[in-house]
Amino acid sequence: MSYNCCSRNFSSCSHGGYLHYPGSSCGSSYPSNLVYSTDLCSPSTCQLGSSLYRGCQETCWRPNSCQTLCVESSPCHTSCYYPRTHMLCNSCLTMHVGSRGFGSNSCCSLSCGSRSCSSLGCGSNGFRYLNYRIHTSPSQSYRSRFCHPIYFPPRRWFHSSCYQPFCRSGFY
């Protein structure tokens, strides 16, 4: 099964009121349960769990996974897919592979509330690290480690071993 992967420049793309992006429309072939971000990459068709080269590397990731795969290939910036659904995980893994010599780093992204990013339970600079146990409000019933599907601005990737997400109102 393949998906048509949107490139960057999509305008106000809002999938189910989930997140909003700059650029043009994503189109119906955009997987509703994946969030995709890239820079300077042309669209291509990706097989789940595999990648194709079209001037840069684009990657599709399984929608039922709590992992995030981020790949950088010159001259392009990073391409990432995130699971759209909130999922409980035993661990959160973020992989950074690219020409800048980065290996693998593990971290959990910040928990997003309805209006802002929460810094509770986070490490230095507001980042939450691998296997950090968190407790959210009873209404959300997330009491263990989990990954949130969050869009990261592409040019802020290689900032630290963990990355602060870009949260929008109405995340939940």
UniProtKB/Swiss-Prot annotation:
Span of the signal peptide: none
Protein purpose: In the hair cortex, hair keratin intermediate filaments are embedded in an interfilamentous matrix, consisting of hair keratin-associated proteins (KRTAP), which are essential for the formation of a rigid and resistant hair shaft through their extensive disulfide bond cross-linking with abundant cysteine residues of hair keratins. The matrix proteins include the high-sulfur and high-glycine-tyrosine keratins.
Organism for this UniProt entry: Homo sapiens (Human)
GO cellular component: cytosol; intermediate filament
The Sequence repeat ranges on this chain: 46-55, 56-65, 66-75, 76-85, 92-101
One Pfam short name: PMG
Region called 5 X 10 AA approximate repeats, residue ranges: 46-101
Subunit structure: Interacts with hair keratins.
InterPro entries per UniProt: KRTAP_PMG
Family stated for the protein in its record: Belongs to the PMG family.
Name of the protein in question: Keratin-associated protein 13-3
Keywords: Keratin, Repeat
